[in-house]
Swiss-Prot record:
UniProt entry tagged with the keyword Signal: no
Every Protein kinase domain range: 85-366
Protein name stated in the entry: EPD1-interacting receptor-like cytoplasmic serine/threonine-protein kinase 5A
Effect ascribed to mutating residue 225 to A: Normal phosphorylation
Positions carrying Phosphotyrosine: 165, 167
Active site: 215
Organism: Gossypium barbadense
Post-translational modification: Phosphorylated at Tyr-165 and Tyr-167 in the presence of pathogen-associated molecular patterns (PAMPs); this triggers the expression of pathogenesis-related genes (e.g. PR5 and PR16).
Induction: Induced by the V.dahliae elicitor EPD1 (AC G2WWH6).
Taxonomic path: Eukaryota, Viridiplantae, Streptophyta, Embryophyta, Tracheophyta
Length: 462
């Protein structure tokens, strides 16, 4: 089976047909910009080039994009890789379409190493379409970073549109946090994931031609075997504003619960829109709650609106921390992470930090050791008379917990040894108890529809 090396001449004539009209930001063809000397002869193709047949997008760009290393697969090859898209290899389904696990062997193509892959098939009746497929190919062909998922190749055959990615064995952050039988993520792992995702966003925002991700959420953060985070699903990504422009005007797309309020209201998209979404995910990591959960009381359904007022008060913060952590986290680290989430969720976009600043704040948090926080020894009260506990019951138990921690200081060595053992079992603690759990690009995929209390929807946000 022959696999062709990627060239833009092979994809443009067949796969640029049916491109939608440019959105509001593409009012006029931009002037050709001089290439940045730092980038040498490389200049990333902007998505706006898709809208103009006379532009350089119709030329052979294989020279300037020679380092992309994408492969063009045939549909028959992908059928072999996935065993005819067998239900046994089905990983799940998102807005783009179904995802199947496959395996590329050494005989498929010299130079293409044997490896497991995830094959995503565009559902022609799904939420996304050809433009989103092409957007993902164009962006991931040109962007490379340790915290972006790797696109290995694609298939564009008749009406079929498929993408072939590296396989991410730990699945998505959404599944790790919210799947019914998932093992709780330790505090240190949560901060590692947050930092990795932040680095991915910072890379996009600070590129020569900035990219706005536009759909940052827990289900789009995939995890490798070491829980290193990688951003996936670039179908809604947009080129950032250039020159003296402050924003990109576009249709409001994304996922409820994650989208920035000013973007929903105006359609004005900036890098700060991604920062807000990052703040929501950071809140999910802190609290173990979904960004939008209709199973909760009306006041608590929107996580950002409910939790943000409590992020700057230590005592209130302790009450909203994920109970699955069982009090095993760094108090100082939690306060700093909560303060960062508070800034990211500011309703004034200009007051949010840049993602590069977010990275600088998160990096030191990985060095904080997990300790047993007072709320860990909280015991659920039982009232034989059916009455309610006194209002200060929680505060009293927190004081008792702190007193108990002081008594444990003499046994500090044993607790420190326990923490080391706890970390050494990190890999074991994260093995799913059910092989049916999953996330996009992984055997651990669980579709949004099957996750309990799921209410996030990818859609036009009216």
């Amino acid at each position: 089976m022959a696999v062709m090396k990627f060239t833009w001449r092979s994809i443009i004539p067949r796969c640029s047909k049916g491109i939608e009209e440019p959105e509001a930001e593409a009012e006029a063809e931009p002037e050709t910009k001089k290439q940045d000397s730092k980038q040498g002869s490389f200049s990333r193709l902007a998505m706006i080039d898709l809208s103009y047949p006379s532009s350089r997008f119709t030329e052979d760009l294989s020279t300037s994009l020679a380092g992309s290393n994408l492969y063009v697969f045939t549909l028959e090859e992908l059928k072999v890789i996935t065993q005819c898209f067998s239900s046994a290899n089905f990983l799940g389904e998102g807005g783009f379409g179904p995802v199947h696990k496959g395996f590329i062997d050494d005989n498929l193509r010299p130079g293409l190493e044997a490896q497991p892959v995830a094959v995503k098939l565009l559902d022609l009746e799904g939420l996304q379409g050809h433009r989103e497929w092409l957007t993902e190919v164009v962006f991931l062909a040109q962007l490379s970073h340790p915290h972006l998922v790797k696109l290995i190749g694609y298939c564009c055959e008749d009406e079929h549109r498929l993408l072939v990615y590296e396989y991410m064995p730990r699945g998505s952050l959404e599944n790790q946090l919210f799947a019914k039988y998932s093992v709780p993520l330790p505090w240190s792992t949560r901060m590692k994931i947050a930092l990795g995702a932040a680095k991915g966003l910072a890379y996009l925002h600070e590129a020569e031609k900035p990219v706005i991700y536009r759909d940052f959420k827990a289900s789009n953060i995939l995890l490798d075997s070491d829980y290193s985070a990688k951003l996936s699903d670039f179908g809604l990504a947009k080129d950032g504003p250039e020159g003296d422009k402050t924003h990109v005007s576009t249709r409001v797309m994304g996922t409820r619960g994650y989208a920035a309020p000013e973007y929903i209201m105006t359609g004005h998209l900036t890098a700060m829109s991604d920062v807000y979404s990052f703040g929501v995910v950071l809140l999910e990591l802190l609290t173990g709650r979904r960004s939008l959960d209709k199973s909760r009381s009306p006041r608590e359904q929107n996580l950002a609106e409910w939790a943000r007022p409590m992020l700057n008060e230590s005592r209130r913060l302790a009450r909203i921390m994920d109970p699955k952590l069982e009090g095993q986290y760094s108090e100082t680290g939690a306060r700093k992470a909560a303060a960062l989430a508070y800034q990211c969720l500011s309703h004034r976009a200009k007051q949010r930090p840049k993602m590069s600043d977010v990275v600088n704040i998160l990096e030191p948090l990985l060095d904080y050791e997990e300790t047993s926080v007072g709320t860990f020894v909280y015991t659920v009260p039982t009232h034989q008379n059916g009455g309610s506990p006194p209002k200060d019951d929680t505060d009293t138990k927190e004081c008792e917990a702190k007193t108990e921690l002081k008594k444990e200081n003499g046994d500090h060595h044993n607790r420190h040894h326990h923490r080391r053992s706890h970390k050494s079992r990190d890999g074991h603690r994260h093995r799913n108890k059910s092989s049916s759990q999953s996330s996009v690009h992984s055997e651990n995929y669980t579709s949004k529809q099957t996750l309990e209390n799921g209410s996030n929807e990818e859609c036009n946000i009216d």
